[in-house]
Curated annotation (Swiss-Prot):
Alphabetized SMART domains for the sequence: EFh
Species lineage: Eukaryota, Viridiplantae, Streptophyta, Embryophyta, Tracheophyta
Family membership noted in the UniProt record: Belongs to the calmodulin family.
UniProt xrefs under CDD domains: EFh
Top-level taxon of the source organism: Eukaryota
Residues lipid-modified (S-palmitoyl cysteine): C173, C174
Protein name as annotated: Putative calmodulin-like protein 2
Length: 183
């Protein structure tokens, strides 16, 4: 969370305090429900508890400010990553028709110095092409790239880590000179 500015932390503190109705330094599922209700949402108690559990790193049953900060920092990181992924998609989608065809994928990977065999191309398409139409649309590309990014972060490579092994490049990373090396 050291990448958040003092201004962002101050804004997030204000937001946290709006949720923390009783001022005890934690957000309970009940407090979360109150705020969501004021925003026109009506989640069930079970849904509220699940939301709290997803953020509650220490298992206390409520959300402390540090946990709240962690959630918001992840959301900010994911937003920036999606912009980079969108740009990478544009690079792959040579004719800008909204789809990456097998030929476009093969062409870009070859230009990145990583030509694909027929089997490797088939594997990449199989992994990404969830609707089975033989090409990759933006949502399919985004899903695969965000999953790769999360996997890399969990493996300790952070958002700037890039491994140069061919197996990694062929499973989602776009190469050292590409805008998607942050993945």
């Amino acid at each position: 969370m050291d990448h958040l500015t003092k201004e962002q932390i101050a804004e997030f503190r204000e937001a946290f305090n709006l949720f923390d109705k009783d001022g005890d330094g934690t957000i309970t599922s009940k407090e979360l429900g109150t705020v969501m209700g004021s925003l026109g949402q009506s989640p069930t108690e079970a849904e509220l508890k699940k939301m709290v559990e997803e953020v509650d790193a220490d298992g206390s049953g409520s959300i402390e400010f540090e946990e709240f900060l962690g959630l918001l920092a992840r959301k900010l990181r994911d937003t920036g990553a999606e912009d980079d992924i969108r740009e990478a998609f544009r690079v792959f989608d040579k004719d800008q028709n909204g789809f990456i065809t097998p030929d476009e994928l093969r062409h870009v990977m070859a230009n990145l110095g990583d030509p694909l065999s027929d089997d490797e191309l088939a594997d990449m398409l199989h992994e990404a092409d969830s609707d089975g139409d033989g090409q990759i649309n933006y949502n399919e590309f985004l899903k695969v790239m965000m999953a790769k990014r999360r996997q890399n972060m969990m493996e300790g490579h952070g958002s700037g880590g890039h491994r140069s092994s061919n197996s990694h490049k062929k499973s989602g990373c776009c190469g050292p000179n590409s805008s998607c090396t942050i993945l």
